[in-house]
Amino acid sequence: MGKGTLYIVSAPSGAGKSSLISAMLEKNPTYAMKVSVSHTTRGMRPGEQDGVHYHFVEKEHFEDLITKGEFLEYAEVFGNYYGTSRVWIENTLDKGIDVFLDIDWQGARQIREQMPHAKSIFILPPSNGELERRLNTRGQDSEAVIAKRMAEAKSEISHYNEYDYVIINDDFDTALMDFKAIIRAERLKQDKQAAKYSGMLDALLAE
């Protein structure tokens, strides 16, 4: 059995990243895929579940994990730590399961430095106007917060050229097909097929 592939997925807020990842998992139940769940020291919000949205841990425990080198990447945001578990990702990949890592461009850089074989996907909105419309439609943020998100989006988008693949999420179904095409193409690469079908290949090449 071959190893799974780590997919780094980045996008500006409102581009549809989370929806595409969720749909990919939901519509392809036979694919061996999981989403990485980050650790955080912030408090649990209403509706959140430990181990589903985040692994909620105490600051002291998080800092102990940092000391032990158990995070692929971590950052402190507004006084709270957020980090990606190295152990969980490596164990999951070793089982032949692909892992999606939803992360920003800065975290993506850290991950690529440590796991250069990871594949990266950047999801773009079709226009700034459409991105702003989607943020407004969600009804979650004030005008000031939306303006801040739009400014952050420009910074995030400027790093699209650091990624292996780019998906334009203009039509959701088309973007989802593009997403699946990337996963399929990666699974059909020679090294993946050789690991998956080693027995068959040995038989085909036997005298």
UniProtKB/Swiss-Prot annotation:
Guanylate kinase-like domain boundaries: 4-184
Q: Name one GO cellular component term.
A: cytosol
EC no. given is: 2.7.4.8
Cite the InterPro entries for this sequence.
GK/Ca_channel_bsu, Guanylate_kin-like_dom, Guanylate_kinase, Guanylate_kinase_CS, P-loop_NTPase
Q: Which reaction does it catalyse?
A: GMP + ATP = GDP + ADP
**CDD domains listed in its UniProt record:** GMPK
What function does this protein fulfil?
Essential for recycling GMP and indirectly, cGMP.
Q: What is this protein called?
A: Guanylate kinase
* Organism from which the protein derives: Vibrio vulnificus (strain YJ016)
